[in-house]
UniProtKB/Swiss-Prot annotation:
It catalyses: L-seryl-[protein] + ATP = O-phospho-L-seryl-[protein] + ADP + H(+); L-threonyl-[protein] + ATP = O-phospho-L-threonyl-[protein] + ADP + H(+). SMART domains: S_TKc (SM00220), TUDOR (SM00333). Pfam families: Pkinase, TUDOR. CDD domains: Tudor_TDRD8 (cd20430). Belongs to the protein kinase superfamily. Ser/Thr protein kinase family. Changing residue 860 to L: In a lung small cell carcinoma sample; somatic mutation. Residues 298-355 form a coiled coil. InterPro entries: Kinase-like_dom_sf, Prot_kinase_dom, Ser/Thr_kinase-like, SNase_OB-fold_sf, Tudor, Tudor_TDRD8. The keyword Kinase applies. This is Serine/threonine-protein kinase 31. It comes from Homo sapiens (Human). One of its GO terms (cellular component) is acrosomal vesicle.
Length: 1019
């Protein structure tokens, strides 16, 4: 990025080459003497230093960084600890090369400035990428004093003192390093000399380090190393080194002597080439590097002491200056406050002088205004503030409390015994045992009948409805005053606390009102006496002092009493009072609702008892007859026999050498009529079965046991779907070869309705499973009451000659989504209408704990292009078997990712297939982009925002949406918009409808030819 974004700057600094710098770092000379300058101290034996010969390199690095880094971008993504970055040093706001040591948090990192050795915690925003030409080894090297190490038991204070001491000997001073060895981490172990002073010996004398034990291999000392993280953090707490305060990123100032002359010439050459390099004013004097080797250690200590004293005095000076400024600011603030207080005092004095002139007038007017309010309040009943309405409600609840009727408990016991007797009959398998249980049940019925009569009589005698009306009115009136009640525990302690509070408040208010009356009476008496004093017509001697005495006290007392009464009457109650009233209100409302629930329970039981009594009278000691059902079955048997005979007769006439057309036509009409009669009787049979099923479930569970010949138990287990009177050969069926790839399908007509017969091969075990699964599906459809969104099942019957089960369903030609989209795709409005119906179908199934597992474009139907319904599934397969088939719609798999991973099918997998179908209908012929999990990407399509949101929830995010939530999605709740007429679309749709009508007409003709024996497969 730096090369692309700053090519112009890069070209301007082409003369600055770093190849030499890299070469210098790569040349490592052991057993040599190096002249270095200390740049950073880590501890009493470890420090970082820069070679004297690298001064010019540091200048070049600083110039390049100052140009590159401000324009570079902050580092994104993960930080590489082996990579060199540019870091903004906090002290001088200049850029230096650094490496990341540790990631502290998302925003902060610990870095080391590799050309100086010190560390700092930086924000990620202060770290930038630098070009490859600046990615070379560090200028500063890490050194360790030869033969020394820090004692493992050294205290922190001594450790810090040792670090400071070594800094006074080495930091920013020219020292000679006699290299002895190099450790594995690159630390150079050397003997350090400053002039004639052996720095290691001085550190050892001070006790800040101790000698190492000689190693067997090298002279490298064995030392217990400090944790690098702890050492870095400890160095962070130490004072910022002086090199951090330099400007323009220079490390050393201009050298003295021959080094100064050489650098001046070099810089002059660079200035002539166009690369201006300036030196800061506060740069360190390189002359300090050339201190004479004869400088004594005592001189070093004196210099260090003077530096420390100067720093201390400077700190004290700064502190005093800050204190002076703070005091000066405080004096100014106090002066301003004093001036404000003087102005306020003058205003107050003027106000008091004005007030005193009108004091009596103002006070009497205020008292008169309060008296007007008090008169109005005396005419208002404020007892509600003391919970009078709650007290009245409690009294109503206590006085007319409705209790559970005595006969109800006995009724519940007998009813439970009766229900148990019915259950025993239901589970009984032997007729002899069943007869005994039936006799016991009948005896229990007699007792139950008498108990029901007693209960009805007791309820009739009680004023149940009147009490309920009273409670409802009371509840409404209280809710109008107090609003929503909070939930709380039912406790008599709350009511006791309320009564105590009410008595205290009433007593307090009575006392205050009496005090107000007394004060007003005293004030009136004073005015009457005063009137006589100033009335010249009154004869006699009156002492004015007696009349005028204590008027201020009288006014004060009167005002206080009036205000106190108004406060009680007008001011809002305190939190404690409100809490007591609120708790009491909640308690009262709970009692009201509890009694209402009891009354509602009794009323419901009363209603059930009335109905039970009516029906019980009809069936008491009686058993329903199945004769009518047997009569229907007998009629059906004869009709089916006659129908079969007519079919044989028709076949014989058609196969004769000289067929009589009129006779054949007559027999066909008779056959059609016989078929209609058969189905009419089958529907009558179903009605009779429904009636017997209702009786068996409610009154006579013994019916399946006593009359096994009618097959009532099978009918009940099938949910009313199974019929034993329908047979395959009774239907005029036409094979549907184009739809029979998986199972035999035939098309027929029943009472004017075109139906499909689906054939399933079954054995003994599969037959029961098919009936059970079809019955569960059928019950879900019936319970939805016409708004199921499911394909209805008409009949289920078993073939007597072959191991086949047949399912009769309505036939919707060319109405499945695959056919509709192939002929004329649904528009967006039609798609939403259809898919809302499909969502309703899935909701119906999932509500009944049924997982479809086989939702695809061939078994979802769009009736009239606006009503969507979900087709049935293969009832011979379990849900796992159905879901294991990978159905495709175009290039899109309808199998959810969890199914592909081997997890069981769930409502979520149904909704995934639903979402894929909705996406397919919405984008039509556009290509899908699939990710590695097989999930289609939705964002690539331009769809309505609400539809896209639903698709993302169903397909991409895989949120735990339910079918009910899908049904209530915003895209399905949009108001119907007035669609703009599209003549081309209307014409296309009209042609499509005509084409469909022609196809249907041809299909009907073909069906008729099949009936006449003239069918061919070209129609």
């Amino acid at each position: 990025m730096w090369v692309q974004g700053h090519s112009s700057r890069a070209s301007a600094t082409e003369s600055v080459s770093f190849s030499g710098i890299v070469q210098m770092d790569e040349d490592t000379h052991y057993d040599k003497v190096e002249d270095v300058v200390g740049s950073h101290i880590e501890d009493a034996v470890t420090f970082w230093a820069q070679s004297i010969n690298r001064n010019k390199d540091i200048m070049k690095i600083g110039c390049s960084l100052s140009e590159v880094c401000p324009q570079a971008s902050s580092v994104l993504g993960n930080l590489d600890p082996n990579k060199i970055y540019g870091g903004l040093f906090s002290e001088d706001q200049c850029w230096y090369r650094c490496k990341v040591l540790k990631i502290i948090s998302v925003e902060k990192c610990l870095v080391r400035y590799i050309d100086y050795g010190n560390t700092e915690i930086l924000n990620r925003s202060d770290i930038v990428e630098i070009p490859l030409e600046l990615q070379f080894s560090s200028v500063a090297k890490k050194y360790k004093l030869w033969g020394l190490h820090i004692p493992s038991d050294q205290e922190v204070t001594q450790f810090d003192q040792g670090t400071t001491f070594l800094g006074s000997l080495i930091f920013e001073k020219e020292i000679k390093m006699r290299i002895k060895a190099t450790s594995e981490d690159g630390t150079v172990i050397a003997q350090a000399e400053y002039g004639s002073v052996d720095i290691g010996e001085e550190v050892l004398k001070k006790g800040f380090a101790e000698k190492c034990r000689l190693a067997s291999r090298t002279d490298i000392c064995e030392e217990k190393k400090l944790d690098p993280g702890q050492l870095v953090l400890r160095n962070l707490k130490s004072p910022i080194p002086l090199w951090g305060h330099r400007s323009n990123q220079s490390t050393f100032s201009r050298p003295k002597g021959h080094l100064s002359e050489k650098m001046t010439l070099d810089l002059k050459d660079e200035n002539d080439a166009g690369n201006l390099i300036t030196f800061p004013k506060e740069s360190l004097a390189v002359g300090d590097f050339n201190l004479g080797s004869n400088v004594s250690l005592e001189k070093i200590k004196q210099d260090q002491k003077l530096i420390e004293e100067n720093e201390k005095l400077k700190t004290e000076k700064d502190a005093l200056l800050e204190s002076y400024k703070a005091l000066e600011l405080k004096v100014e603030q106090i002066a301003q406050e004093l001036q404000q207080e003087k102005a306020a005092a003058v205003d107050l004095t003027n106000h008091l002088e004005y007030t005193l002139k009108t004091y009596i007038d103002t006070r009497m007017k205020n008292l008169a205004a309060k008296m007007e309010i008090l008169k109005e309040m005396r005419h208002v009943d404020i007892s509600v503030r003391f919970g009078k309405d709650l007290s009245d409600a409690i009294q109503v609840l206590d006085e007319g409390c409705f209790t559970t009727p005595a006969s109800l408990n006995g009724l519940e016991i007998i009813w439970a015994e009766y229900s148990l007797a019915q259950e025993n009959i239901k589970t009984c398998e032997y007729v002899s045992e069943g007869n005994i249980l039936i006799a016991q049940r009948n005896e229990m019925q007699q007792k139950l009948y008498m108990s029901v009569e007693d209960f009805i009589l007791e309820v009739d005698e009680s004023s149940l409805n009147k009490r309920l009306k009273t409670l409802q009115d009371l509840s409404v009136s209280l809710e109008a005053v107090y609003g929503q009640a909070k939930e709380g525990a039912n406790s008599d302690e709350i009511l006791k606390k309320f009564y105590d509070w009410k008595c205290d408040k009433r007593e307090e208010f009575t006392s205050v009102r009496s005090e107000t009356d007394a004060s007003l009476h005293r004030l009136v008496a004073w005015f009457q006496r005063t009137l006589k004093v100033f009335d010249l017509s009154v004869e006699g001697s009156l002492i004015s002092e007696d009349a005028m005495d204590n008027i201020d006290e009288i006014l004060e007392k009167t005002e206080s009493s009036v205000c106190k009464e108004l406060e009680i009457a007008l001011v809002d109650q305190g939190d404690a009072d409100k809490e007591i009233i609120s708790n009491t209100y909640s308690q009262v409302l709970q009692k009201i609702h509890s009694e209402e629930r009891l009354i509602a329970t009794v009323q419901a039981k009363y209603k059930d008892s009335i109905e039970f009594k009516k029906q019980l009278i009809e069936y008491l000691n009686k058993s329903p007859s199945v004769d009518h059902l047997l009569s229907i079955k007998k009629t059906l048997k004869s009709l089916k026999a006659l129908l079969r005979w007519k079919l044989v007769e028709k076949s014989n006439l058609e196969e004769s050498d000289d067929p009589d057309g009129s006779q054949i036509e007559k027999i066909k009409e008779e056959i059609t009529q016989l078929r209609n009669n058969v189905f009419q009787e089958i529907y009558h049979e179903r009605e009779e079965y429904e009636m017997l099923t209702s009786l068996a479930q409610k009154w006579f569970p013994e019916l399946p046991l006593l009359h096994p010949e009618i097959g009532l138990l099978k009918y009940m287990n099938s949910g009313g779907l199974l019929t034993m009177s329908l047979e395959r050969d009774l239907l005029d069926a036409e094979p549907m070869k184009e739809l029979s790839s998986k199972r035999p399908l035939v098309r027929s007509e029943v009472n004017g309705q075109i139906i499909l017969l689906k054939g399933y091969s079954v054995d003994v075990d599969t037959e029961a499973k098919v009936i059970e699964r079809a019955a569960t599906y059928h019950r879900a459809w019936r319970e939805a009451e016409g708004d199921s969104g499911l394909l209805p099942l008409i009949f289920l019957f078993l073939c007597k000659s072959d191991p086949m089960a047949y399912l009769m369903v309505p036939y919707y030609p060319r109405a499945n989504l695959n056919a509709v989209q192939a002929n004329m795709p649904l528009n967006s409005e039609e798609t939403l209408k259809v898919m809302k119906g499909v969502a309703q179908g899935l909701h119906t199934l999932h509500k009944a704990d049924i997982i479809h597992g086989s939702l695809h474009q061939n078994n979802v139907f769009a009736l009239n292009r606006e009503q969507g319904i979900v087709g049935d599934f293969d009832f011979t397969k379990s849900v796992s078997q159905r879901a294991s088939v990978n159905m495709m719609v175009g290039d899109l798999s309808l199998m959810s990712p969890e199914l592909k991973m081997g997890k069981p099918a769930s409502p979520g997998s149904d909704l995934y297939a639903y979402g894929c179908l909705l996406l397919w209908l919405s984008v039509q012929n556009q290509e899908f982009e699939i990710n590695k999990d097989g999930i289609p990407k939705v964002d690539q399509f331009h769809l309505d925002d609400k539809v896209k949101s639903l698709l993302c929830s169903l397909i991409c995010y895989r949120s735990s949406m339910t079918a009910e939530q899908v049904l209530n999605a915003e895209c399905f709740l949009m108001p119907k918009e007035q669609s703009v007429p599209n003549p081309e679309k209307d014409t296309e749709y009209t042609l499509y409808k005509k084409e469909e009508e022609i196809k249907t007409e041809n299909l009907d003709k073909c069906m008729e030819k099949t009936r006449n024996g003239e069918a061919n497969f070209d129609c």
